[in-house]
């Protein structure tokens, strides 16, 4: 996606997607979760537009079609690198460790001109419903609606409540919990007190602060 949007000639080409990763989140949204089904869609020439989130950092411009995560979302990704030998289970172990550490960060979050200042456990901005391996992080998200869906867990949430809320990510019912706030926006900015690494489409990349805007039907 980054290579396509950085073309100097501005030409946009169709992208064929075949699931070969560990999560295949966007393909879950497209209902193309098997290689055979994805290949048939490509052969048939089935195309559709997808929005892209443009992320401006201090010295980097990058793009996302799935997830921009900050806080606990990134901490789990960082810690899991030490447990790669565990396979997919490394994320479960890393999540438990980070829940018990219960780190929060102070930040200013601006969502379509609305400003929120406070302590956050994590913020996740999603273009797709699914993140990771089948988690329904943003159940109201649409790949081509011109909006990005943000979830925040604010305040001093307890370990017990985190352990209760996070498993509900798999069926999307976490959005009904009082500690979770759900927004839809065309742009947002995040300014933490300290610079932190981000989780962008499953990769640890860049640092805050960031300014994000949705490029509707960019690919």
Explain the meaning of each model-derived region:
Residues 69, 124-138, 204:
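Glycine-rich phosphate/pyrophosphate-binding beta-alpha loops
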Residues 49, 64, 103-105, 119, ...:
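A generic structural signal for well-ordered coil/turn residues at beta-strand boundaries
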Residues 5-6, 81-82, 139-142, 166-170:
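Short, solvent-exposed amphipathic alpha-helical segments in soluble enzyme
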Residues 84-90, 139-160:
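Gly/Ser/Thr-rich active-site loops/lids in small-molecule metabolic enzymes
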Residues 5-121, 125:
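Catalytic core of DAGKc-family lipid kinases
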Residues 1-2, 123, 202:
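Conserved Motif II region of HX4D acyltransferases
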Residues 111, 117, 142, 152-219:
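ATP/nucleoside-binding phosphotransfer catalytic cores, i.e., glycine-rich phosphate-binding loops
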Residues 73-76, 117-119, 131-134, 158-161:
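Short acidic/glycine-rich loop or secondary-structure boundary segments that cap or lie
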């Amino acid at each position: 996606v980054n290579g396509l949007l950085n073309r100097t000639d501005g030409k946009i080409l169709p992208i064929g997607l075949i699931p070969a990763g560990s999560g295949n989140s966007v393909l879950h949204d497209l209902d193309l979760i098997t290689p055979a089904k994805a290949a048939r869609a490509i052969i048939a020439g089935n195309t559709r537009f997808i929005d892209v989130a443009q992320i401006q950092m201090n010295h980097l411009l990058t793009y996302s079609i799935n997830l921009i995560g900050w806080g606990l979302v990134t901490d789990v990704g960082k810690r899991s690198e030490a447990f790669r030998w565990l396979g997919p289970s490394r994320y479960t172990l890393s999540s438990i460790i980070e829940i018990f550490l219960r780190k929060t960060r102070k930040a200013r979050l601006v969502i379509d001109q609305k400003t929120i200042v406070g302590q956050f456990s994590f913020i996740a901005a999603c273009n797709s419903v699914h993140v990771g391996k089948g988690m329904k992080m943003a159940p109201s998200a649409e790949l081509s609606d011109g909006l990005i869906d943000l979830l925040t867990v604010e305040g001093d949430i307890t370990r017990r409540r985190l352990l209760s809320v996070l498993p509900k990510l798999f069926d999307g019912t976490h959005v009904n919990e009082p500690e979770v706030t759900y927004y839809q926006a065309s742009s947002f900015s995040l300014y933490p007190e300290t610079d932190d690494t981000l989780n962008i489409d499953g990769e640890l990349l860049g640092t805050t602060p960031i300014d994000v805007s949705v490029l509707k039907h960019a690919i």
